[in-house]
Amino acid sequence: MSEQQTAAELIAQGLVHHRAGQISLAMDRYTQVLRNDPRNADALYYIAMVACGEGQFQQGIDLARRSLAYRPQQARAHNLIGQALHRMGKIKDALESFDTAIVCDANFADAYGNRANMLSELGRNAEALSSFDRAIALNPNSPNDWVNRGATLHGAGRIDDAIASYDKAIALDPAFCVSHCNRAHALFDAGRPEEALAGYDRALEIEPKMAEAFLGRALVLKKLARLEDALASVNKAIELKGDVARMHEARASLLRSLGREDDAHAADARAAELEAKKREVSETQPSQS
């Protein structure tokens, strides 16, 4: 058996462990390959994946670039670098990496979907939708692309189209809570509060700790004049995720509607405190290159 066959077998074994969530066993196989061949592009790429999965994004980027040094034109490596850059808040750099991935492989659906997400974050909705449509043409069975496309359509004010996109995501994966929650947001904005409430409730059946769904549910209940129920829902949202200013703002509005002005004032103060902290953190972050 040749050394290259041995490396291929070890990589295959590592992938089995990797997909099963047995990361230490996977790393044993990948690092064994590197001990025998420090220039093995596959081992470097999969170790980069592990690093990114553990939140070590810069290390993952460095490893992926080493893999590219030994085997250029790997679309998957550029895609991984883009994902890591996104997690580091470097949206424009991430977009450039996804563009490079597509140059390497014009039929790489994941890269088109990731590229679309970056364009959407940059407010370039028309380009984002074009990229989502390309991703979906290549892989029509990706719930993530359908739900992210829906979010972009919603942001562009195309509510009915957004709902249709969320419907497609739900048809592909009925247990994807984000699809139900986002669809409920769109239904609420479309003036369909009862359907929106059912959507939030479905999201919470799937993921009972989804703070965003509790907040959305509270806003719908307020619209339906069920103020005490709405307050209970926003309180639950804050219990789950208390560091989001808009949740405290929503609570303040409800308390004010219930005539509890002192409590509303305290909630407003908490929201202002959180907004100030957010601005402070933002000002200390390095600017996007």
Each predicted region: which residue ranges?
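TPR-adjacent "capping" and linker segments in tetratricopeptide-repeat scaffold/adaptor proteins
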Residues: 1-9
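Conserved alpha-helical positions within TPR/SEL1-like repeat arrays
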Residues: 11-19, 42-53, 76-87, 110-121, ...
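Structural marker of alpha-solenoid helical repeat scaffolds
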Residues: 36, 70, 104, 138, ...
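TPR/TPR-like (Sel1-like) alpha-helical repeat modules
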Residues: 239, 249, 253-279
